[in-house]
Regions:
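Juxta-kinase regulatory segment immediately upstream of eukaryotic protein kinase catalytic domains
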Residues: 1-32
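Alpha-helical protein-protein interaction elements
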Residues: 2, 31, 36, 108-111
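Detector for Asparagine
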Residues: 3-5, 37, 41, 63
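Residue-level detector of alpha-helical secondary structure
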Residues: 17-24, 42-45, 82-89
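ATP-binding glycine-rich phosphate-binding loop
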Residues: 25-53
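ATP-binding pocket architecture of kinase catalytic cores
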Residues: 48-130
C-alpha cells in the first residue's frame, strides 16, 4: 500500500472523508459532492437532507452546503476565526456575504487531520445591469 505524498496533503482528502466530516457535524449528507474552484484550499458543494440544515438566508439552497477545507500550515486557527468573525459581522449588517455556519458554538472544525468550515450554499444570480 502506498502512502500519500507528505507534500500533497490534500491527496488524503477523499470524497468519503469529505462526506464524513460534514456528517460528523450532524448534517445528513445525501451523497452529492461537487468540487468547486479554489487555488489554495479545497472547496466542495455537498448535498444534504433539507431537514438536517437550517438556513438563515433566503438566498441559500435548503439542501446543500459548501465545505471549505483549509490548506495545512497556511493560516493559523486565529487567522481563520478572524476571517469568519468578519464575515459574520458583515452578514449581521445585512450585507450579501455567505458567512460560515456556527455549529456547536464554532465556525472552524476538524476531521481527519483537516481544518474546515461549512457555509450556506448560495447559487449565482444574474448581474444587475442598470
Amino acid at each position: 500500500m502506498s502512502h500519500p505524498d507528505p507534500e500533497k496533503p490534500f491527496a488524503r482528502l477523499t470524497p468519503e472523508r469529505v462526506l464524513a466530516a460534514v456528517e460528523g457535524l450532524g448534517l445528513a449528507a445525501d451523497g452529492r459532492l461537487m468540487a468547486l474552484n479554489s487555488y489554495e484550499n479545497r472547496v466542495y458543494r455537498i448535498g444534504v437532507e433539507a431537514e438536517s440544515l437550517r438556513v438563515r438566508d433566503p438566498r441559500a439552497l435548503p439542501n446543500a452546503v459548501v465545505a471549505k477545507f483549509y490548506r495545512a500550515h497556511r493560516w493559523s486557527d486565529a487567522q481563520i476565526r478572524e476571517e469568519h468573525a468578519f464575515a459574520l459581522e458583515l452578514a449581521a449588517a445585512e450585507l450579501a456575504v455567505a458567512a460560515p455556519l456556527v455549529i456547536d458554538g464554532d465556525t472552524l472544525h476538524q476531521a481527519g487531520g483537516f481544518r474546515f468550515a461549512l457555509f450556506e450554499c448560495w447559487p449565482g444570480g444574474a448581474p444587475e445591469l442598470d
